[in-house]
Amino acid sequence: MKVTFYEDRNFQGRSYDCMSDCADFSSYMSRCHSCRVHSGCWMMYDQPNYMGNQYFFRRGEYADYMSMFGMSNCIRSCRMIPMHRGSYRMRIYERENFMGQMYEMADDCDSIMDRYRMPHCQSCHVMDGHWLMYEQPHYRGRMWYFRPGEYRSFSNMGGMRFMSMRRIMDSWY
């Protein structure tokens, strides 16, 4: 898996090749305005240490990603998303700490309100696979990356309320 970052738009200026997670680009380049994802899927963050807004990038060229995604800040850190082969399973909960209504999911859901009559979820347990969750129905708005693990509360995620979710499939690589 590899991504090349460029200081300027249209793949100009100094570049940095990245083949694993990078918590802070500042030691390699002062800014980043374009990138080429040669292989793999990546989460990009507009703050160091995998903080701030998250953006999903898959194989392709992003000559001016800030305009493309409506970003106000440059990418400052990135995380490689490992390829997952196998089943996908996640439990979503109506309230924090795995309380309230619970639903188990194994496929994409473009609206938890339409499917489960649940306005949003506030905690989840990802058992299998890697997922993207979105603050609005139909995979819109800000997103957050979830890998296997327990997420007891979304309150530390900038007050995000998730209303749709999709699997990161191996066909995206």
Swiss-Prot record:
- GO molecular function terms noted in the UniProt entry: structural constituent of eye lens
Keywords associated with the record: Eye lens protein, Repeat
Q: Mind listing the GO biological process terms from this record?
A: lens development in camera-type eye; visual perception
Q: Which domain of life is it from?
A: Eukaryota
Q: Which SUPFAM superfamilies match?
A: gamma-Crystallin-like (SSF49695)
Annotated region Connecting peptide: the residues are 83-87
Chain ranges of the Beta/gamma crystallin 'Greek key' domain: 1-39, 40-82, 88-128, 129-169
Xref: InterPro entries:
Beta/Gamma-Crystallin, Beta/gamma_crystallin, G_crystallin-like
Q: Does the keyword Repeat apply?
A: yes
Question: Briefly, what is this protein's role?
Answer: Crystallins are the dominant structural components of the vertebrate eye lens.
| Subunit-level organization | Monomer.
Which protein family is it in?
Answer: Belongs to the beta/gamma-crystallin family.
Question: Domain annotation text?
Answer: Has a two-domain beta-structure, folded into four very similar Greek key motifs.
Output this protein's name: Gamma-crystallin M2
Q: Which organism is it from?
A: Cyprinus carpio (Common carp)
Query: What broad taxonomic lineage does this protein's source fall under?
Result: Eukaryota, Metazoa, Chordata, Craniata, Vertebrata
